[in-house]
């Protein structure tokens, strides 16, 4: 399936320099018999005192239009999701990360929350996984 | 000790191809920034990118490459990053 191959290609194309620098440790999880491919990325946040977060980007057949569906999951058990695994909404909050929004989402180019929830008039265009992760890393550190 | 060369080889890692070239130390950082921007097709969106060294943005692009190199201890092959700035609207 083309959407899956495209997803794998962009994940495999993440630059080792940035992956290593930020300790992202990208990991693909596939669910047999489903149209879902998950990418789990480990993030370290200077803004949150070094807290370790696990971001799950869910690729589905419409990901190139709808965006990569974002959620933070338990870094120790990545099958568990929930608001407790998101950065806090305040004190300190993380710019662009909106755990209190319904649905919780991230306001950065490249993900579902931006292109399908908050700014549905703004197409995915040529946004890239690497560009999104660098922007997210930046707001987690600033 | 003054650098007898008037060029320095710098590497800029970008989200596209990297820059790995000699730069005249008398040129401003803007030249390096523009070269890296070209790789990502960002010439028209300068404000959406940052040139960074050790995670610190080099914001004064009018400074001479040689002056910054001396201050920060750059040598041939020193690596910088060109990264996108978050656009939160």
Predicted feature descriptions by range:
Chain B
Residues 1-89:
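Ubiquitin system architectures
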């Amino acid at each position: 399936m083309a959407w899956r191959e495209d997803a794998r290609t962009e994940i495999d194309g993440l630059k080792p320099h940035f992956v290593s620098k930020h300790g992202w440790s990208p990991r693909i999880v596939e669910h047999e018999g489903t149209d879902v491919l998950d990418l789990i990325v480990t993030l370290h946040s200077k803004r949150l005192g070094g807290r370790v977060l696990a971001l799950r980007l869910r690729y589905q057949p419409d990901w190139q239009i709808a965006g990569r569906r974002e959620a933070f999951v338990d870094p120790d058990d990545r099958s568990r999701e929930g608001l407790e695994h998101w950065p806090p909404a305040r004190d300190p909050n993380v710019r662009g990360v909106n755990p209190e929004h319904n649905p919780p989402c991230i306001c950065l180019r490249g993900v579902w929350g931006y292109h399908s929830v908050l700014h549905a008039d703004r197409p995915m265009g040529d946004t890239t996984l690497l560009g999104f992760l660098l922007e997210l890393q930046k707001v987690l550190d600033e | 000790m003054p650098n007898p060369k008037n060029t320095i080889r710098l590497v800029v890692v970008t989200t596209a191809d990297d820059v790995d070239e000699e730069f005249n130390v008398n040129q401003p950082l803007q030249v390096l920034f523009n070269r890296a921007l070209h790789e990502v097709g960002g010439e028209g969106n300068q404000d959406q990118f940052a040139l960074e060294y050790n995670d610190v943005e080099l914001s004064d692009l009018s400074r001479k490459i040689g002056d910054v190199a001396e201050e920060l201890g750059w040598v041939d092959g020193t690596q910088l990053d060109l990264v996108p700035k978050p656009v939160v609207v």
